[in-house]
């Protein structure tokens, strides 16, 4: 499966937006101000900013000063937002429990609505706060005021009772919003996404199925808020045999959305979706909330849409997915895709067999060590990097694909800790570039998995020191950090939250917080017998390049 857009986190080392305005009309206000990354403060510009004003209540920093918090989040184009779309994968565990983890990233209670096929659903009866850890987790209804500040709730979106052998229903003690139909699109067709609306800025992940260790088909992704969507993408899926059925989804947030795709392979027609020829642009039209769901041949080679260029007239969300991802015991464990011709790559430490050059849409898979740094020549040569792990049987997959402007020109690659083929199913997860690391995260680990591993990366601070990192279940700072390569800029460590079905010290599966005064990246891995999920716990998802790759060459 795939995991993957952003957490309840902050990045105090790197303010996200600069606006020139006068605070509250004061004549002595600084000429230039900027917003803190968490949007709670107005700061002076420069490398050592000071707080000019704190935005309280439902206000956040944005153009002109303290404005509505959701408007501030929209203006920041960060991973924190108030509007998301979610889709479950087209997997053989039809109708299983589809849920979203909604983290309240603000200082006031949050209400949540779901919108599906034009109908708005108050999510309060279907939102529950997990209590406890491990197998003792219970689900508490949210307060009448909403999800508390700094907390998270699981919103149970969909389930449809099924006789499928690996069907996993939602916990018996909770209520589910949609129970009369499976919201997942089936086969190449026009479908419908579920919109998630929050009253204050949030970070949202989805997981399918929730509690899915016994399904052998889990999938999770970190969602991007719609203001962080874009009009230009390079598609990434994965071709595997014997029954991968790789696919791609496009989701619209506006009526009249036109999506032009330059496919790398032929596309077979489906319900409402026209056929297309490789290397010939094709355009699809959908309206708000609709999806173009393209699933490819079930087996063989030449069925992978990776490298296809996508451009739209309005911002869209793009997902890569797989019906049944399979993988041999000794696969390449890294996937890199180029966005610009003439891209050159350097590695620290050197990685035998890794590509040193890339062109537009080129996919290269390679094996590499547990930790390395890879970088292109500059930020006008961004590229995509994903981590992959093998596993028994097959696994469903879906991930929201980062748009081209959010791709980095450098990454720190940390492999999954487990090398046991029988532990976990095949899994792929986006690697977040250090330019989008945060300083704190709130995240939830599924209690039905016997193994949970946190892969952490920290960045040397401007004062040439590494800052302590604290996890809520560990007394004192995390220890055991190892250097990545020889540059001295990055360190990494693996932290087990659960191992072989047992707690690790005071740590166990459930709700967690982690923080530092320096920049920190975190990938959550959960795995069990023939089942895996993974997602980045967060990312700033701000635009970090100005590259545009048109599907119709100029």
Give, region by region, the residue ranges found by the protein language model.
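Ser/Thr-rich, Pro/Gly/Ala-heavy low-complexity intrinsically disordered linkers and tails
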Residues: 1-30
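Extracellular interaction modules
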Residues: 13-15, 54-58
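Feature targets compositionally biased, intrinsically disordered low-complexity regions
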Residues: 2, 7-8, 24, 45, ...
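Broad, structure-driven detector of short, well-ordered beta-strand segments within folded domains
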Residues: 19, 59-61, 318
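Extracellular, cysteine-rich, disulfide-stabilized repeat modules with beta-strand cores
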Residues: 33-51, 58-66
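Short, solvent-exposed secondary-structure boundary motifs
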Residues: 24-29, 49-54, 300, 503-504
């Amino acid at each position: 499966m795939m995991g993957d857009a952003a957490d309840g986190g902050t990045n105090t080392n790197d303010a996200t937006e600069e606006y020139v305005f006068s605070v509250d009309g004061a004549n002595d206000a600084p000429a230039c101000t900027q917003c803190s990354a968490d949007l709670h403060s107005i700061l002076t510009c420069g490398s050592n900013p000071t707080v000019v004003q704190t935005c309280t209540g439902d206000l956040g920093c944005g153009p002109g000063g303290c404005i509505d918090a959701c408007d501030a989040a929209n203006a920041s184009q960060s991973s924190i937002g108030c509007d998301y779309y979610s889709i479950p994968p087209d997997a053989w565990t039809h109708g299983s429990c589809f849920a979203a983890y909604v983290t309240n990233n603000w200082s006031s209670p949050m209400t949540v609505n779901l919108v599906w096929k034009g109908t708005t659903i108050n999510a309060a009866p279907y939102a529950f706060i997990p209590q406890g850890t491990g197998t003792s987790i219970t689900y508490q209804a949210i307060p009448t005021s909403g999800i508390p500040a700094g907390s998270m709730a699981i919103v149970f979106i969909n389930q449809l009772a099924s006789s499928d052998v690996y069907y996993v229903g939602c916990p018996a003690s909770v209520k589910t919003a949609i129970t009369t139909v499976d919201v997942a699109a089936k086969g190449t067709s026009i479908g419908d996404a579920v919109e998630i609306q929050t009253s204050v800025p949030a970070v949202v992940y989805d997981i399918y199925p929730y509690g899915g260790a016994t399904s052998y088909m889990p999938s999770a992704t970190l969602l991007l808020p719609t203001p962080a969507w874009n009009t230009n993408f390079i598609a990434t899926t994965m071709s595997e045999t014997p029954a991968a059925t790789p696919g791609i989804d496009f989701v619209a947030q506006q009526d009249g959305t036109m999506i032009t795709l330059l496919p790398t392979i032929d596309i077979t027609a489906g319900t409402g979706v026209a056929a297309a020829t490789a290397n010939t642009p094709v355009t699809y039209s959908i309206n708000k909330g609709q999806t173009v769901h393209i699933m490819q041949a079930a087996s063989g080679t030449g069925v992978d849409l990776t490298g296809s260029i996508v451009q739209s007239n309005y911002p869209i969300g793009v997902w890569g997915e797989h019906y049944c991802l399979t993988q041999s015991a000794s696969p390449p464990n890294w996937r890199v895709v180029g966005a610009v011709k003439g891209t050159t790559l350097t590695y620290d430490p050197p990685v035998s067999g890794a590509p040193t050059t890339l062109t537009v849409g080129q996919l290269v898979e390679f094996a590499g060590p547990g930790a390395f740094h890879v970088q292109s020549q500059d930020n006008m040569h961004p590229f995509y990097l994903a981590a992959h792990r093998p596993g028994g049987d097959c696994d469903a997959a879906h991930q929201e694909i980062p748009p081209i402007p959010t791709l980095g020109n450098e990454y720190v690659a940390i492999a999954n800790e487990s090398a046991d083929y029988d532990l976990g199913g095949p899994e792929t997860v986006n690697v977040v570039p250090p330019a989008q690391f945060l300083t704190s995260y709130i995240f939830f680990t599924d209690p039905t998995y016997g193994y949970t591993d946190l892969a952490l990366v920290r960045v040397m601070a401007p004062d040439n020191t590494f800052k302590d990192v604290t996890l809520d279940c560990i007394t004192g700072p995390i220890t055991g950090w190892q250097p990545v390569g020889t540059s001295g800029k990055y360190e990494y460590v693996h932290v087990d939250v659960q191992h072989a079905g047992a707690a690790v010290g005071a740590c166990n599966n459930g709700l967690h917080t982690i923080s530092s005064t320096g920049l920190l990246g975190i990938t959550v891995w959960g795995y069990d017998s023939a089942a895996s999920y993974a997602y980045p716990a967060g990312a700033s998802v701000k635009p970090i390049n100005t590259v545009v790759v048109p599907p119709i060459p100029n």
